[in-house]
Structure formats: C-alpha cells, structure tokens
Amino acid sequence: AGPINVFTSRFYKTSDVPFLGINGTADALIDYDTNGLIIPERITNASLVTIAGGSHLGFLAIADPIFRFMHNPDSIGCQAVLSVLEDGTDDVFVSFGSESDGVLLDPNVPTICATLPPREAAHPGRQTMILEIAVLAFFESVFGETEPIRSAAKEQLEISLAADFEEATFTD
C-alpha cells in the first residue's frame, strides 16, 4: 500500500513492467480512494488486489502476532508517523522529479493519517495470507517457467483468491 497519487500516468509510461498494487480499504496512513483505487486506470499493465478492511500495519509480517487483538493497528501507526513528520512528505516526492516527469503533488489529496482509522480492520493474519498468496501468484503469473504455470497462477490471482477470501477482490 504505497502512495500512488503523486505519480501521474506519464510517470508510469516509462516502463511496461507488470504492476500489482495491494491495498487495504481501512488504511489510515495511505488513503485507499486516492491511492489504491486509481491503480488500474492510472497504470498501464496494472492490477489491483483490494483487501476490504485491510490496514496499513496489517501488511507487516509481525502484524499477526503483535496486532492480533487490536481493533485497528493503524491507530498506533498514525501516532508513530505523525510524531516524526515535521512538515509533511512533499519534499520526498519532489526529489523524484517534476510535473514533466509525471510527479504532481495534488493539494486536494488527503495527507498521511488525515482520516482517522476506522475502529475495525481486517484480521492481520488473514491480511498477511492474502498478501502472500497474491504476491506469489502475481510473480508466478509473470515469471513462471511454462505457460501452464503462468496460467494457473493468473487464475489463482484473478479468481481463486477472492473465492477463498471474502475480503479480497481483484481488479484488472
């Protein structure tokens, strides 16, 4: 779940490498609507796995044992991030380039933790399982040694993942 909104379609046209975004709808640090949801329309050759209720900290490998009994671990994440940010994150993105390079800072996009995290988030163990299956299936669908392996992995990513996990959806 990364900040996509500062990079325009022009930025992504420099490469035709397949792209998979995996974002959670309850991510308080990186707003889903302005970062995850825009991936398929903004990036050519991109797909999106959405985890309903997925939090930002739920993507961490340590999330399941540590945050298992929390309602939404992003409440801790926001406190930690906001305590070390001085004036925001714009300077980081400016270093990637200018508008002509496809980097555009939109002042209307919510900043990190601008919206309080919802009380409930997906279970971090399930979120981790979805993440690991999606990443493996994506890599196998692109780099699998044979067409049957690539095809089976693509089906796992596009169809089976959502069938196995009700909180997961795939968008091409």
What does each model-found stretch correspond to?
Residues 1-59:
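The feature captures the conserved acid-bearing segment of alpha/beta-hydrolase catalytic domains
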